[in-house]
Each structure stands twice: as C-alpha cells, then as structure tokens.
Amino acid sequence: MKIRSLLVLLLSLWVAPFILAQQTPQSLADAELPSLIAIYKDVHSHPELSGYEERTSALVAKELRAAGCEVTEHLGKYQNSKYKAYGVVGVMKNGDGPTVLVRTDMDALPVNEETGLPYASKVVAKNDEGKDVHVMHACGHDTHIAAFIGTARALRKLKDQWHGTIVFVAQPAEEIGAGARALLKDGLYDRFGKPNFALGFHDKADVQTGHIAVTKAYASANVDSVDVTVRGIGGHGAYPHKTKDPVVLAAEIINAWQTIVSRQNNPLDPVVITVGSIHGGTKHNIIPDEVKMELTVRTYKPEVRERVLADIDRIAKGCAAAAGIPADLAPIVTVSKDFITAAMYNDPELTKRLVAVWKKALGNENVEIIDPVMGGEDFSEYHLPDHSIPSVNFHFGAVDAAKIAEFKKAGKELPTLHSSKFAPVPEPSIRTAIVGMTTAVLDLMKK
C-alpha cells in the first residue's frame, strides 16, 4: 500500500505541471463562466446611476480582492458635489515589467427595462434632480464588469506567463463623461503609476457574439455640450414689427450652423452639430424675449473642435447682428465644462499588434476592423491629451448571429445600446471579452 501511495503521489507531482501548462485564457474563461454569469445577473438586477455606484463598486472591490489584487476604494474627485467617490483600483503585481491599465465602467442608465428577462431590473432610484426614475444596464456595463472580474481571475492563474503590474480600474460615471476625469483628478497615475499601456472594452449591439471588433486611430468623437440663449425684444404676436423676434432668429441660426458642416468644414473631417432642445415662449400670441437651445457637437481632431465651437459662437452673434439685435442683447453661447468627452484614439501600432493576437486566439474570421463612430467614450481620458499612453478600447459582439440575420431579413433595426429592449447574450459575450482582454495583456506583458 505504501508503495502504491508513493507511486500515486509521484504521478500526481509529474502530471500537475502539465495540467497547469494547459491552462489558457479560453479554458479559464470557460471554467469561470458559471460564477461570472451569476455576478452578471446580480449586477443587471441591481443597476445604479452614474455617481451612485455604491453597491456595484463594493461588489467589484470584493471580487478583485478575491482575485489577489491590492484594492483601493472610494476614488474620484468630481466637480458635482452630489457624486460620491466610488472608483475602485485593484493592483496585481508580478515582479518587474511593464504596467498595464485594464478598465471597466460600472454605471447604468435612467431607462425602464422592457427585455422580459427573468433577472430584469425593477430598480427605481432618485436622479440628480431628485426625481424617481427607472434604472437599467442598457449599455452592457454589467457584461463589462463580469468580464473584468473574469480577466483578473484568469491573469492571477497565468502569472507564470507575464511580469509587471496590472492596474485594474473600475470606473464610475462613464455615462455622463465624468468618471475617468474624476479618477485622474484624484491622482490615479500619481498613486498607482502611469501605465505603459491602457486597455478597455465595450459590448457592441450590432456585432455577433464570439467576435471582436476594433477601430484604428480615432474611434469615438469629442463630445461638447453647448447652451445658447438667443435674446430679442418681446411683444404682442400681432405686432411683430415692434419686436425683435428671437424665435425666427433662432431658426435662422440653426440653419446657418449647418453650413459649418456642409460648407466651412473639410468633408474628410467629420463634424456633427445637433440641436437637441429648443424652448421659447409661453403662449400663442406672445413673442418671447428669449429662446434657449441645447446642442451636442461632435468632432475628432482638436483643431477642428476648436474651430467649430468658435464658428457656432460667431454665426449666432452674426445672425443676431444682421437681425438688428442690439449688441447688449447678443446671443449667449456657453460650452459646458461639466459634460466634455475627448475623442478616443486607438493607437494604430498597438491596435495592429493586438489584432494579430486576437486572430490567433479567436480565428481570423472572428476579428473585425470597423469604422469610427460619432458617439463619446471617456476611456479617451486614460491615453491623455497628447496620446502619450498607447491605448486600445475594443468591442466584443453581444448579439446572436441568428438574431442579426432575422432582423436583417425583416428589414428591422436591432435594439441599440441605451434601448429598453437591449439584452446581450451573456455567456459568449463575456467569454469573448475575457479571452480578448487576457490575451492582450499577456502579449504586452509576456516574459
């Protein structure tokens, strides 16, 4: 019996290294999926609005500690004092080597969920104005969180394949474009080191599960919020000649702004100017004293952004002068400092390198190069304005291929991100995100 036991022990010692050597990002993702799906469903059922991610951040901190990270909680300095510091950083060290930042976002949206899922959100919370709103993970940040935790678990078990320091960043308030800046303002790079690379991911509502999609160079836009007050001289609607009508003037200004896009801008430099809100007046027969407008302005290049914002101001005031508005009643144009998101730039060389890694891990047919979008993403803050930190934010598909084909055949649009009906397929989405992120980190930190 003793000899037999000794043989079993020797055999187990001989086999163990080979078992460990067989661990891969794919096998570890598969092994962790059941518990990660449970986390995903829990987070999906308990969404929290931007700046109020108390429960979510505590859950992420707990999981990062369990994955072997040294965790710091309650990071973030906001301009808005209503928001508490719910940023979380987990540091995983493995000797000398490069530092790689891995980021997830955590916040949800004021959307009334209509997916019909058994774990659908029923949460109602107070928004910034104190009003009750339904809350939903309508942008897939719950899938990001689960994949983020899965990545930390996998990289802990693959420490023999990498060296250096991984800084896991769980960021609040992405949806309002404030979270990344709040963490950097709180000394993220001073306290945890400026990374050599920064990586992020996001689910995509029109790409099939199992696929990674990525954009080279500019991937998302500068986002500026502009408030404009068009002033006039009000009066009776029957006597417009005795007034300076700000309603007609506002209409002229809106049309003139579109010439910035069509006639004053290089068509190879995308620009979007959208007037999302216009309000003025109180009654049918009263010409008001002012009209208020709210704009969103989207650009890529910093020099284009500066010129377009200046043009918006110039045209508004020029139209007012042409309408005979006194100089002391010129339009007031204000670019918000609270809701600005910089354009996201995927470093071309790093993107090329990681595309090769993903094709090897997932197959050539499962990696797509996609066009940039005019949406905003505050992951852009991590590469800094001078793009001095090579960064890539990639997408993972979240929709079943059969569903994509079904909607295409019917000529219908799939539920988009931020839709009350958006429901990613969790298992393959989260698995692909883990494999994508883990293989990227391993390549950048390989021994």
Locations of the language-model features?
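Divalent metal-coordination and catalytic microenvironments
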Residues: 43, 64, 90, 102, ...
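Metal-dependent amide/peptide-bond hydrolase catalytic core
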Residues: 248-447
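Acidic/His- and Gly-rich active-site-bordering loop/insert found
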Residues: 22-137, 146-163
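Bacterial N-terminal signal peptides
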Residues: 8-18
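Positively charged n-region of N-terminal signal peptides that target proteins for export
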Residues: 1-5
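Histidine/acidic-residue-rich, glycine-tolerant segments that coordinate divalent metal ions
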Residues: 87, 124-136, 142-143, 155-277, ...
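Soluble non-cytosolic domains of exported or imported proteins
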Residues: 30-34, 47-58, 142, 146, ...
